[in-house]
């Protein structure tokens, strides 16, 4: 071997350079030497870092001097936008948008300026070195240190249009500091959530792919996938990178010369990849885990390189787990969601094309545009059909390509200056996927005044709920003409009329407080309570002058007793000082004549009660009579039946224990009520028990009443009033129970006098005595201690004139006998007089005066107080609008709302009622200073009234009507606008999860079911119809949901499954559309094609999410996962096979079941490919042990037991759980089996095509590497060099196996194995 000359690189090596260097060393010299080299580089780096002592200090933070200019330019632009807004030329939304975009581009420019400034002034600046070498920090942090922090979002995720203009070097103001702390907190919370989410994602991925192990050498498939470059936004995943480590399906030939660049089944190294790209080949068909035909695993050639070693993957490598970790690990780096950017601003700003030189603009032939209002409110054109824009100037000419959706800011034939903005080019690839959402923004009035519509038509729309909204379909202007607006309090009447001239302090309106019933005025002591003063008017009163009120204290609670002259005692039910309504109980007679000792059954005899009446209050007695009471003792038990100590219908003495711990108080017959072996109730019925000989005669008497002296049965005479109960099965046999009945007589009228009173005005108030029965006829009253059967109550009745008033209960001392206290009932009308509060500025100043004195007698309807509303400033009254019944607001045009403009002798050109903006001509040489309305025109001057216009975009919801008076800050309208949903609906982790779980996205787009030509028609009501004329002439209609925008234009050709509207694509739709389309060509072909399409869609989508965040993952990892998601089909119809419909199985198993059908002529099974999310796929795996250890353990195990499943212990997880050696790496079974010496094993397949025994492994082609070192000098044995060392030792025997070689194992393998294993884990 010749000595190679060392290579000397003289350049700055940053992080990327270092990565490339180590990768190059690794792929050329193996792990050991790379480790050594990395070590040396580390020493070198630390040595010089120590000597240099790079640190960061305040002086290193250089703020670019151009910052001030940039900020000033931005401020100026924003000021112009603000002026346009106040002139009513752009809407609030457009202004906001302009502000956001201006600051964002300023920030961007400033960032570039920061970098430029560092480069030009001080390349060895420590901040610059750290950030750009990749050691610490990144550009966005440097930008915040020395540029500006930029725009921040508030907690709702809307952007605050006040940017942080300072940086950390200059220091933040307090406001800026507070604003920026929102974002900081959000960042922390987000990170915490992200780690959890990403961890769970990794777990699901590992579970779905843990059994993917390299088990075969070559599956000899004829299928492959096509790789090409992929762009996401501004990031590109180059074909060269995607090809690395893949195995080509067929020979790759040079397009021109035809020479074979890469032979079939050869792996592509970095050099070969470069060759292929240099030859101008744009797509290559490679083998892939997606198309691998190995059963239940992936073969070596379809997987390609193991990326950790840059050579073909080993047999028994657990590639599934590696794939899962490779996808899961970067999850934490994905942002959960970028800030919702309140406004339309999205992260990617369109590419701007500026004129390179002065000249004229020409549109290319194909370019079709339509007028368009940009999001900043400028007039421009939007490109409908892509084409070219040409700028010509003198000898020079330059062309720009404009894609569909780009915005052109110049017209055809317009002259432009150098550097002028010509167009914003839409980024073609992603613009398709942009979904929009409808958002609203309020427009609030900046001044109080009267509303006037200009060119604004309102149209009423009713929705399904019947609410009416007023919408401005075409947009227009709302002018607010300034003036002072007074809100009138409820009930106020204006005392002025339109056109009145008033002075400051004049009364505008007044409101009065009147009494309804009249009476005696009483002014309570506390004159000044918070809500205003209270005036009470006594309408009627009644005093119980014959009865005394005694105060008793029971158990620490005060209790009032009323004692009448006749000695009856009443308990007061309503406490003194409370209000009693009409019909409410005031007091109740204390009376024990109707008290029972036990519970029982109540019967009415000749008693009539009021039908209506709440059971709670009791039933009022209309006509007296007798109450019959049959006592019984009831115990509610609710215990187990085993605790019962007596039998049903047994006669017990008083004091017997009937149930454990329950004793009866009366003697009698026991009735036991039970349900489901639970004792509900025990009833003891007192009475005499008589055994009977003639059960039939006794049964007829059941339930009757027997009067004293009556013979019930022969020889049995009753001596008291009794009820007869027949008992069929007492322990002694049939018997009759004679139950005593108690009688209570009820008088027609209560024995209590009623109290009446009426005052002079004839309003009556009385206390009426009422008897009430709390229980109904035949009601069974459950009680042990007894109840009251009749209550006598005093009820308040107020005359029919004022039943809505309430009476106050008061206890007053008697005038004659100071010792006695009397009960008085007073009916009050209580009126609150408002206090004058200066708090509400919109109401003007109010002044309230009281017009009555204490003790006055007043008639009904008399005015008690008056409140005047006074004007704050002099002016002219206008805008009293009599809308229906009352006036709510008054407008006064004051002097401060007017402006007098002298015309210096020129005759004014405006007329009264004109609306003018600053700069508009009022007379020759005289312009309007502000936006205003013309109030009066004289020969030498014009009087203007200040006003503000507000532009309203089409479709806005109006909140006011023409002529309305609005206060400052009132909402005028709700602007409805569409904004692109930030980034891609959702980004990062949630999007990855949505894809891998194969969810149906919300608001998904409509896909073309068959190829054809589009017809797009826009209807008048903003709805869109899309039809596709297919190749055979069929017309297919596609429904467009509200809120979806078409992506296709009229006459455009669409292919199969192309999106027709915006929104995310549903992978399930892709699968079914392709499957249905190809079905006529055979099930297998259709299933394979449709699965391939959905696989490539998923791989590309997942790649694009990671790529947009700048994370690179090798395709093969995603492919392994997607393979697991798309491996199953669902049997729809079993045909004549032994399958079950609805069963999930692999495509291969379904085809195997169908093969014999082709021979026997039976009906084959029909199936549909299904796309399973990773969770579903994990639960549907063949191994029930793996599925059970993942989720829903009981369900999985139960089903497995019912189906009698067997687990073949294929994957890693099952083996780990059972405690066997895992079948990967050295535990891979083919080693054991091939060393058995029995080479000719057959694969035993069961009906599902599951292999039990794996045939011996064919010899794998070893990679050859030129080891430059001579063995004498450098015996560093590692994965790469080992074969050569061994070759030397064994004398060129290539088919060498450790186990069967002559060399003793220990000599070589210890070190080699350990070294290799550790390396493998730590390599990346």
From Swiss-Prot:
Residues 1293-1324 are annotated as: Disordered. Residues 1302-1324 have a biased composition (Acidic residues). It catalyses: RNA(n) + a ribonucleoside 5'-triphosphate = RNA(n+1) + diphosphate. The keyword Transcription applies. Zn(2+) binds at residues 219, 292, 299, 302. Its cofactor is Zn(2+). InterPro entries: DNA-dir_RpoC2_beta_pp (IPR012756), DNA-dir_RpoC_beta_prime (IPR045867), RNA_pol_Rpb1_3 (IPR007066), RNA_pol_Rpb1_3_sf (IPR042102), RNA_pol_Rpb1_4 (IPR007083), RNA_pol_Rpb1_5 (IPR007081), Rpb1_funnel_sf (IPR038120). One of its GO terms (biological process) is DNA-templated transcription. Keywords: DNA-directed RNA polymerase, Metal-binding, Nucleotidyltransferase, Transcription, Transferase, Zinc. CDD domains: RNAP_beta'_C. Gene3D superfamilies: 1.10.132.30, 1.10.150.390, 1.10.1790.20, 2.40.50.100, RNA polymerase Rpb1, domain 3. GO terms for molecular function: DNA binding; DNA-directed RNA polymerase activity; zinc ion binding. NCBIfam families: PRK02597.1, rpoC2_cyan. This is DNA-directed RNA polymerase subunit beta'.
